[in-house]
Amino acid sequence: MKVSFISLGCAKNLVNTEQMMALCRDAGHTLQEEPAGADVVVINTCGFIDSAKEEAIDTILAAAELKAAGQVQKILVTGCLTQRYQQEILTELPEVDGIMGTGSYGEIVPALAELMAGGRPCRFADIHGMIDEFDRVLTTPGHYAYLRIAEGCDNRCAYCVIPSLRGRYRSRRMEDVLAEARRLADAGVKECIVIAQDITRYGIDLYGEWKLAALLRELCKLDFHWIRLHYLYPDEFTDELIDTIADEEKVLPYLDIPIQHCNDKVLKAMNRRGDKAELLALFRKLRGRIPGLVLRTSLITGLPYEDEAAFEELCEFLQEVRIERAGVFPYSPEEGTPAAKMLNRVDTDEAERRADLIVDVQSRIMDDFNDSRMGGVTEVLCDGFDSQAMMFAGRSYAESPDIDGRIYFTADHEVEAGEFVPVRITGAMDGELTGELAE
């Protein structure tokens, strides 16, 4: 059977897609990149916010067009959208031949068999259960890969549906994480990107204490060059974790700490732990302890209780803290969440206007950061040659894949993807940096 996978949404979802691909490969199925010509197209969806839901529906409809044209036989939809809208998908999208929830990725092979036998699989398992340990088919370039260390979330932010889609927080056993990490390192992965919905909480459910620092020290013993950290909850930083990040050379001084907002009233209404003073203290502590630190965060504008004063406070906070990278999203009420029932709403157009203003603030901060790098030499991991820019493209410690842009550079000889090279920064191009090989 020829199977094509389409993965939407976050890197955590991508890991699930890669696991399903490995299960299909091991069962003897043929994996193909393009949907056209496949027996089955598997679409692993995101259903977190409105834009993600729209992308998922558009992707399903595009696959349905291929099916109508006889280029695809069956469509199987998995992931967060199906977990959230099981009945609606079955009823309103008759083109979909089967669905699976977020607790059922391990059932992909029997689901495909049921599908091709004429059935309409509808497989949903316990989303709070133990994490299945499966091999993966890496879809990222061979020099970097994601390492997911936990599933689910216990933070219960008032605006977020993730706990209802992914279940309670479950850490993977450290020995399982390290076994997978060794396989990645042995396969030639140079940059290991540690992810979960909240990696700072790692270990508390299994071992009764936070274990991220201990895990990082073990990962540093493996043959990775870089270890990058994503999704750290701000009030769970221990001194041990900060010291480990500062002292371990392989752990990059790049931290993705989603804060969403800084106003105390908004944070409390959204069931976010901590307050503005604690955020300021944390960022000062991190900057003082970790040289060259680059911060990334996520921000939401237009949350309930965000009046004009709270929004101005957020703008001033960002100008004070100077967070180098940020993803900015206008709030969209998600059915089934406490925030969706709150009365202190901000108009959708106003939320979008505020998001645009925050993007402007962050653009100026990023420009200042880029200006500070001019003339300096930085280590760059080459991602390959970009035929459009006619330059090599890569990333320094300050750029995470897909979300932070790249550094484009010239060289008088071939630079291989996965090679680390020194690059002198000489300019900027549409917010991204340009440079030249500094050998």
State where each predicted segment sits.
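Conserved, mostly hydrophobic/aromatic
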Residues: C157, V177, V194, L229, ...
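Terminal RNA-binding accessory module
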Residues: K341-E439
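Proteins enriched for Cys/Gly/acidic motifs involved in redox and nucleic-acid/cofactor modification
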Residues: M1-Y202, E240, L255, A277-G288, ...
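Conserved SAM/AdoMet-binding glycine-rich loop
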Residues: I75-G79, R84, D186-A309, Q319
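Structural recognition of alpha->loop->beta junctions
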Residues: T91-G106, A213-F224, D247-Y254, E313-R325, ...
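Short glycine-enriched, charge-decorated loop/helix-capping segments at active-site entrances
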Residues: G47-F48, R166-G167, L206-E209, K268-G274, ...
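Generic beta-strand/beta-sheet core signal
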Residues: I6, I195-Q197, H230-L232, P258-Q260, ...
